[in-house]
Amino acid sequence: MEAKIQFIKGLDEKVLPDVRLTRSRDGSTGTATFRFKNPNILDKSTAKEGEITGMYLIDQEGTLETRDVNAQFINGKPEAIESIYIMKSPEAWDRFMRFMERYGESNGLVFTKAS
């Protein structure tokens, strides 16, 4: 099973996100901010599929989800989706990183450490 991201269950998001990670100094918590520029979920053709109910990160281990999803508008038109996934334990961080590794492999993404 390929790792994928969905905003409406059953409808894969094709646009690749910019993902920014932060982690507490002690490693106990972390935040991932996903930004999708012009995602296909905002296309008029996908409007009939249903409403955005959250962001679902799906792989062979299961589903990670967040309800923290916001659209950004420019001149009255939706241009981007920003979603925040919060990890509240070192185990949740490790699980998220496993998902991102699979998602990156499936989509040709690379991890760049901040300098």
Swiss-Prot record:
Oligomeric form and interacting partners: Part of the photosystem II complex.
Superkingdom of the source species: Eukaryota
GO biological process, one term: photosynthesis
Pfam families documented for this protein: Psb28
Disulfide bonds: none
Family in the record: Belongs to the Psb28 family.
Organism in which the protein naturally occurs: Trieres chinensis (Marine centric diatom)
Keywords: Chloroplast, Membrane, Photosynthesis, Photosystem II, Plastid, Thylakoid
PANTHER family linked: PHOTOSYSTEM II REACTION CENTER PSB28 PROTEIN, CHLOROPLASTIC (PTHR34963:SF2), PTHR34963
Source taxonomy: Eukaryota, Sar, Stramenopiles, Ochrophyta, Bacillariophyta
HAMAP family: PSII_Psb28 (MF_01370)
Topology within the bilayer: Peripheral membrane protein
Protein name: Photosystem II reaction center Psb28 protein
Transmembrane helix in keyword set: no
Record localization: Plastid, Chloroplast thylakoid membrane
